[in-house]
């Protein structure tokens, strides 16, 4: 029987978690207040920038900038994903294209197709993953 344990604690004043399987560390995560690529926010359009075609958004962690903001009006709500690290004093760069990445698959909501990792060479395993997704 596989023994799985999740440990929650603080590391250097930040929340941390670890996944241990059969006494071996499998995953380690430190939560910080800096928005990192991959985080998903429900944002509200703050003000469109007409000349650039983008817009500034309000998120729980501050201001964000969306490059492809055409057709959005002030007050509109949308889901966005952080696409890069924000420079000091600048807005968080975000995208409307949501990607949920894992070790085996990439899920692209609202887009057709299945994306299975190329590292999985075993055809049976690939078919199992496809069956789980559908």
Where are these regions (language model features)?
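Single-stranded RNA-binding surfaces
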Residues: 1-134
């Amino acid at each position: 029987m596989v023994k799985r344990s999740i440990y929650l604690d603080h590391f250097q004043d930040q929340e941390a978690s670890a996944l241990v399987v059969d006494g071996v560390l499998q995953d380690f995560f430190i939560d910080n207040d800096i928005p990192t690529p991959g985080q998903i926010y429900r944002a509200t359009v703050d003000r469109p920038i007409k000349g650039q075609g983008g817009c500034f958004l309000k998120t729980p962690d501050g201001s964000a900038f969306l490059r492809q903001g055409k057709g959005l009006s002030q007050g509109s709500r949308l889901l966005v994903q952080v696409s890069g690290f924000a420079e000091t004093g600048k807005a968080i760069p975000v995208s409307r294209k949501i990607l949920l990445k894992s070790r085996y698959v990439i899920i692209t909501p609202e887009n057709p197709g299945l994306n299975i990792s190329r590292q999985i060479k075993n055809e049976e395993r690939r078919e199992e993953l496809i069956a789980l997704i559908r």
